[in-house]
Regions:
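PLP-dependent aminotransferase class I/II
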Residues: 1-126
Length: 126
């Protein structure tokens, strides 16, 4: 059988973090608001929450017009100690799924080449 019990130390840590959840989400929303305002009048699209939802902004994302601009921004930010990264690879591109049935996912493939994940941690200050 499986042992799904959580060790006491992990449970204590989880309870302590849950007591701060409102602060964490409020701070992430403030950071996202700053990003949104900063990129508002540019050719770089900040991926915002949809009108019918409320995001926790766990991960903030920029969408560029093309892969070259994204790659230039990735290089520039990382050279200047701003840690950014491309998104995770699409599952269809992972070796372990190479033999699986695949659909046409041109939109996902296009976005994968133009997305940049930007700093999203709670300790960020506006």
């Amino acid at each position: 059988g499986y042992n799904y019990r959580m060790p006491n130390l992990n449970a204590s840590l989880g309870i302590a973090q849950m007591k701060k959840i409102k602060y964490f989400i409020d701070t992430k929303r403030e950071v996202a608001s700053t990003y949104k305002e900063f990129f508002d009048n540019s050719n770089i699209h900040f991926y915002d929450e949809p009108n019918n939802a409320k995001s926790n902004f766990w991960l903030n994302v920029l969408i560029f017009e093309n892969a070259l601009l994204r790659d230039e921004a990735l290089e520039y930010t990382n050279k200047n100690n701003i840690i950014t990264r491309p998104p995770w690879k699409l599952m269809t591109k992972l070796k372990m799924f190479s033999d699986c049935e695949k659909s046409e996912i041109t939109n996902s493939e296009d976005l994968e080449s133009r997305i940049l994940n930007i700093p999203s941690s709670v300790p960020l200050k506006n």
